[in-house]
Amino acid sequence: FPYTTLFRSDKIEDVMLRLYYNNIQSIRPDSLELVSIVVKSCDMVKLMLKEFASFRHSKSLRDHIIAINTLEEQADQVFVTSMRELHTTCTDPVEIICWREVYFYLEKCTDACEHVADVVEQIVMKNS
């Protein structure tokens, strides 16, 4: 394994660490939309992986892959909107820096889910 794989924490842990060490005491409402997309993406990955065991006979595996990709696109849009909201409404530079990190890592969670879906799709295509 390359060095980065061995020492990289998972994406959700990255979000939690930012909340912890930046001592974030209250949650911005716009972050909840990103969190909701992350949860849906993780749930969809779980469903996809259950179907993956029988991918040759699965009727829903492809739908799960498409749903994960769609959720990642939604997260990209919410990320841009949230960052814009943060930078136009917040006047505290420290708060801006802290929340930029949180938003960034929340979006990376959906990127990671999409990566899993991409790998599953590649495996299915190679073995079909």
Functional labels for PLM-detected ranges:
Residues 27-57:
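Long, non-coiled-coil amphipathic alpha-helical linker/lever segments
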